[in-house]
């Protein structure tokens, strides 16, 4: 099964080797037919501590690194 790849924005980089990435997605509500924007936060591993708040990054699924980290930052802009 392929690993999932998501794009988002770093909203916190205070922890050591960890960034919090906010991923937004849009979908059409099945009843009201309105586009709804939903966001979710992921804790991702950043081994070099090189990403700061506001950076756009891509994260990929990986083995569990800690209790909450199962994503790794692969590249950013």
From Swiss-Prot:
GO terms for molecular function: rRNA binding; structural constituent of ribosome. One of its GO terms (biological process) is translation. The keyword Repressor does not apply. GO terms for cellular component: cytosolic small ribosomal subunit. CDD domains: Ribosomal_uS17 (cd00364). Keywords: Ribonucleoprotein, Ribosomal protein, RNA-binding, rRNA-binding. PROSITE patterns: RIBOSOMAL_S17. NCBIfam families: PRK05610.1, uS17_bact. Part of the 30S ribosomal subunit. PANTHER family: 40S RIBOSOMAL PROTEIN S11 FAMILY MEMBER (PTHR10744), SMALL RIBOSOMAL SUBUNIT PROTEIN US17M (PTHR10744:SF1). One of the primary rRNA binding proteins, it binds specifically to the 5'-end of 16S ribosomal RNA. Belongs to the universal ribosomal protein uS17 family. This is Small ribosomal subunit protein uS17. It comes from Rickettsia rickettsii (strain Sheila Smith). The gene is rpsQ.
